From Swiss-Prot:
Disulfide bonds: C53-C65, C54-C61, C58-C64
Prodomain residues: 23-50
Homology family: Belongs to the conotoxin M superfamily.
Organism taxonomic ancestry: Eukaryota, Metazoa, Spiralia, Lophotrochozoa, Mollusca
Keyword entries, A-Z: Cleavage on pair of basic residues, Disulfide bond, Hydroxylation, Neurotoxin, Secreted, Signal, Toxin
Domain of life: Eukaryota
Pfam family, one: Conotoxin
Modification type 4-hydroxyproline: residues: P63
Distribution of this protein across tissues and organs: Expressed by the venom duct.
Domain notes: The cysteine framework is III (CC-C-C-CC). Classified in the M-2 branch, since 2 residues stand between the fourth and the fifth cysteine residues.
UniProt-annotated location(s): Secreted
A GO term, aspect molecular function: toxin activity
UniProt protein name: Conotoxin TsMMSK-011
Length: 67
């Protein structure tokens, strides 16, 4: 019984760090990659030129201002 519990504990400890680490698909896109997609944020009505970020509707305008 103890050996089965030890095997189960070892498997859980080996799998846990793999699920905690962010995968490549979870990483946010960097700004140079966004600039190559021809996104005109300066012409967006939600772009704040003083803060150099978008104040609202960040799914339409990039980069988003922190709240």
């Amino acid at each position: 019984m103890m050996s089965k519990l030890g095997v189960l504990l070892t498997i859980c400890l080996l799998l846990f760090p793999l699920t905690v680490l962010p995968m490549d698909g979870d990483q946010p896109a960097d700004l140079p990659a966004l600039r190559t997609q021809d996104i005109a944020t300066d012409q967006s009505p939600w772009f704040d030129p003083v803060k150099r970020c978008c104040s609202r509707y960040c799914w339409k305008c990039i980069p988003c201002c922190p709240y």
